[in-house]
């Protein structure tokens, strides 16, 4: 047969109604969105969320999480702002690392194992800098802007967070690029 890799956008926030319908098995756990998790200032809490979500994803037959969203939320007008860990590079880096470690690290294997869920970090090279807060999923949001020349800052959560995990998997397994023209 043809191998399948079922994936999902985040589904644990209060808006967890897009694809998952609770059946006789009960419901999936509900957590704050990413910005709410960031408000804890706790990589340990975010990693614990990742471990719980990993188990639930595997139970649902999901092998890849289309997350974490490692974008620096530099423009609060962006409608995806609440899906970020906020605007502060160090905090976003630490929480991105914790999130990916929680999803990917199978404790029985000390790294990759049957319980692992791939973390697809997004949106390279940083989607939170859309011109005027506009989103790149639409034509009017095709340009990323980096006021003050802070392009390099937007890459920090990827280069120092998602690609330098502390768990046995070492780095996020996948990267989702963004649709912007980044300059």
Located regions from the model:
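Glycoside hydrolase catalytic-domain context in secreted enzymes
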Residues: 1-183
């Amino acid at each position: 047969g043809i191998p399948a890799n079922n994936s999902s956008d985040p589904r644990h926030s209060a808006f967890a109604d897009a694809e998952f319908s609770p059946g006789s098995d009960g419901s999936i756990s509900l957590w704050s969105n990413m910005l709410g998790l960031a408000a804890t200032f706790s990589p340990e809490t975010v990693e614990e969320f990742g471990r719980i979500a990993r188990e639930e994803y595997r139970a649902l037959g999901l092998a890849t999480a289309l997350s974490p969203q490692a974008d620096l939320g530099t423009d609060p007008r962006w409608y995806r702002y609440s899906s970020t860990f906020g605007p502060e590079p160090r905090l976003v880096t630490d929480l991105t690392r914790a999130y990916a470690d929680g999803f990917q690290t199978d404790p029985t294997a000390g790294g990759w194992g049957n319980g692992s869920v791939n973390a697809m970090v997004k949106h390279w090279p940083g989607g939170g800098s859309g011109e005027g807060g506009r989103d790149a999923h639409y034509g009017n949001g095709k340009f990323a802007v980096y006021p003050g020349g802070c392009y390099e800052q937007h890459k920090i959560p990827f280069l120092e967070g998602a690609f330098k995990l502390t768990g046995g998997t070492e780095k996020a397994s996948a990267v989702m690029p963004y649709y912007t023209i980044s300059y």
